[in-house]
Amino acid sequence: STLTATLTDLEDGMEYAYRVVADDFTSAEITFTTPAYPQLPNAGFEEWTTEGGGYAVAYGAGQDKFWDSGNQGAWSLKQNVTTADNTVKHSGTYSAKLESARPNMFGIGKFAAGNIFIGQYLKTDGTDGELGWGRPWTVKPKALKGYIKYKPVAISHIEGKNVPDEYVKGEMDRGIVYIAMLNDELKEYNGTKTWPVIVKTKSQEL
């Protein structure tokens, strides 16, 4: 016969032990450990530093880079589109402020959306970027929660190829949040396989 039981109110990342008792039978002790559900590194965007002479990145001293943005590309025109902000926050001291802009120098520039992503900005190709999206994660999450404040403005620039018809200059822009977990092979980039998704904005290629 099979005996089943449901245990509730267990804590994450804890070891538990149990025995089965029936009449005069007592089983050996059996142990199990509940999964630990780690937080995303720097999930509150409290830690910031600068690289490359001035572009902002969301990690602190001694930490591995988990998040990145298009700041490295925008900084070639001396502007950050993603910065630490202490005026809007849920708790702690900072939030990540994503603000679209069209940095330019001597009349040469390109529209850049404020953005932040898990992965790494890999390379600037002219006025475009190549990005590695994703980081290894070994535990299936039970929830992902966050806090967003979004203030849309009217679209001021239409640039690039294959722009969807619903994006019209003068109409209100829309913010986008993408969340994906992949069980996928790593793509090759410069002879190594590190990222599950490679984005090349010049060719709009995934």
Give each language-model segment a name.
Residues T26-I30:
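Acidic, Ser/Thr/Gly/Pro-rich low-complexity segments and short DxT(G/T)-type signature motifs
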Residues T2-T6:
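Short S/T/G- and acidic-enriched coil/turn segments that sit immediately N-terminal to beta-strands
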Residues L7-M14:
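Surface-exposed, short loops/turns at beta-strand junctions within beta-sandwich domains
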Residues K145-K149:
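Short edge beta-strand/loop segments characteristic of extracellular beta-sandwich folds
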